[in-house]
Each structure stands twice: as C-alpha cells, then as structure tokens.
Amino acid sequence: MANLLDYLDWRGDLPLSGDPFNEVDNLILAELSFVDFGGIVPGPGAGAAVPLGEAAAAYFAKTEGRPIDMGVLVPNQIPEMLRRMAAAPRFRDMQLSGFVDHLDTEKAEQFAALTIVCGDGALYLSFRGTDDTLAGWKEDFYLSCMREVPAQKKAVEYTETMARQYPRVKLRLGGHSKGGNLAVWAGVFCPLAVQRRIRSVWSNDGPGFHDEILSLPQHVRLEERIHTIVPRSSVVGMLLEHEEDYTVVDSSQQGLMQHDGFSWAVKGPGFVRLHSVTRQAQLCDQELRSWVQGLSETQREQFIDSAFQVLEASGAKTLTDLKADSFKAVGAIVRALKDLDKETRDALLKFMSILFRSNLRMTLEGLQEETEKTLRGRKAAKPPVKKA
C-alpha cells in the first residue's frame, strides 16, 4: 500500500494553486507538529515565519550525528517525511510560525501546536497528538471524565492568538489522535468571529466528545466543516461520541497499530476508503463504552490516577523509559499493583484484558481478510484450463 511518503514522492511537485488542498495534505501537516521545532520556529507573535525548507535544514543540522527517536508510539517516519516535504515544491515554501511545546508532568498537561501558512490563502493550525510522555497519555484518558482538560483550553487560546496574528486569513484546524480532538474543541469554543473564518477542521483518528458538547449551537454551526477520518480497526477515534459523519480508510497495519497515520493507504489525492470500520472494531467500541459508562466520573478519575500511579512507580516519565528498562519497570508495576485496593486493581486488570482481547481479535480479523484477498487475487490470476 502507498502511504504519506509515497504521496510526497508522487504529488509533491504539484502546487496548491493547481491541485487544491486535500485530506492527505491535512494528515501530513497534522503529523508535522510532532517535530521539535524549538529554537527554530518562533512562538506566537515572537517573530517572522520561517520557510519550511529552512526550518527543516535547521532541524537536521541540530540533530546531526545522533539518531532521531520520536518515541514508542510516535511514527519514526516523521523526520523522513519532513526531509521529503523540504524537497517538494508543494510544501517547501510554506511558512511555519507559532510553535508551542508545553509539558507539566505534575499537572499531567501536554500541549504542542504549530501554524503553517499554506500559501493558498489559509493557515493550518496543527495540534500535536499524544506524544511519548506519560503526562500526555494521562491527560488523554482524562477526556473520558473531565468536562475540559487543560490542553483543550490551551487549544482555544492558541487559535484565538493565531487568528489575531493573521487577521482576515481563512483557517484550517487539524491534528492526529488527541490533536484531532483539540482541533475540533478549538473550532467549537473559539469566538464566533474566528469560527466564521474556519474553512475546515480535521480530526485524524481523534477521540470524540461527551453528548452535551455535540448538541451545543456552536458545534452544530461547525459540524458540516468537520472531517473525521478513522482507520478500519479504529479504537482511539471511536472513543466517546461523534455527531459528524466519519470517513473510514484502509491501513497496512492490524489492530491497534492502525492508529499510525503512516499505515493509512493513499491513492492519488486521497485515502483508500472503505464502507465501515470492521465488526471487531465495533465490538471493541461497544465493550469499552459499556465498561466506561459503568463507572461514575469520580470512579473514572480515580481509576486513571491509580493506573498512572502504577506506571509512574517504575520511575518512568515516558513510554520510551518504560521500554528501555522493561524488566525493572515490570517489577515496579507488579509491586505497585499489589498496593492498590482490590476494586481498583480488578478494574485496571479488566481494562487491560478488554484492550488485549480486542487487539487480538482485530488482528486475527485483519489477517483473515488479507488471506482471503490474496486467495481471491490468485484465483483471478489463474489462467483458465483449456478443454481437450
């Protein structure tokens, strides 16, 4: 299957003036905010925008001589994506500004964003999804029990700030994973004058929202401009509620790993579309929702705090830390589990069991589909037997 990198090779020479902004461009710019442009791209109102080609050169000069590890679940293809963007006429002259990267491990706050001046009369405000930090993942889980998490509030403030910095310019908002949720939240809760300037909002496998958010007038006003894209075995993107229609796309991965945007199949200026998410993804969604809805908001918050207390008992600050010394981490986690009360421990083990079973079922379902596809292809390619 072709992916984002292939798209940059095949269509990177086509300017936006002749080939308009599309859903694949959106995902590329959503992934771009995972790059650490600190010291390269100015913050909001802090200086002139930097051409993407120059920013890429400065980034690779800064990281020269050392491997670029994006983290356990952040795609390691992102630096290569940046390299190809810098060589592509479609992207290299785009301007970057408004880079923000905020992390507070004590308060479980993680927020990062980047503004791209696309050159077609619109900006793309790219909100970073959940990164490698445990604080970021904890805030992600808080989406299920809090009316507003800190990153959502910061996303609204960021959108207002960049709208003031670029008056009368049309806006696109987007992100991958939690970044997609932040993009929609910012679009819904920004001032009406700013919302009227929004051309589109892109949620790439981002979690949804509580029911009461979907019925708000400001969400209804924006609904037709929200584009939600999920892979065929989506789990993250099916969490909570989506009022808007969503597009299902094919992926080269199986199970939970389909969350990786670099696994999404690209054809021409769009993704390879499917009719619906898989049956196992639907069952996983139902099982997770049923489990979550069985807990009060207070119980959910206590569960999240306990779960991350167990992970942090290993001394890890990131998923990479957990992976680097997994033997030590597992020992610390097991000891921390024993210290939990039985009710919390049972809830945590049940949640892990649901995820494990669901991922296994979705993986097996995907492998079965691939096998059937291969067999059909062989049958179609087999020459007919001539009759004697």
Where are the regions that the model predicts?
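Short glycine-enriched nucleophile-adjacent loop
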Residues: 183-192
